[in-house]
């Protein structure tokens, strides 16, 4: 789970609302986003570096190695960031590896409410990572 500064509260609220479902999964999050999620939900989250310190790239590496089945990335389309190239690279790798990606609450709600979200046999990213 990743969120830009202006979207962190939205992602934390989404995680709180979906705590029961998320607790069944291995969760990864970048820096402050992950810390906030842990503080507000008590979910077990593997904390990576902050996005601008390489956390986005760490998530990308996890995707490339078949460790991420879904990407929840609430990004701010109205704010330009110094690490925009990292954001673009993360979104590119998610598409390349066929990882369902949510960039806002509505899409995240659709992904988590899909019967495929908890289906262990549905792993399109892992199939792509084997190539």
Question: What are the roles of these predicted feature ranges?
Answer:
Residues 24-33:
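Short internal beta-strands
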Residues 44-47, 64-66, 89-90, 118-122:
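Short, hinge-like loop/turn segments at secondary-structure boundaries
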Residues 55-94:
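Mid-chain, well-packed structural core segment of small domains
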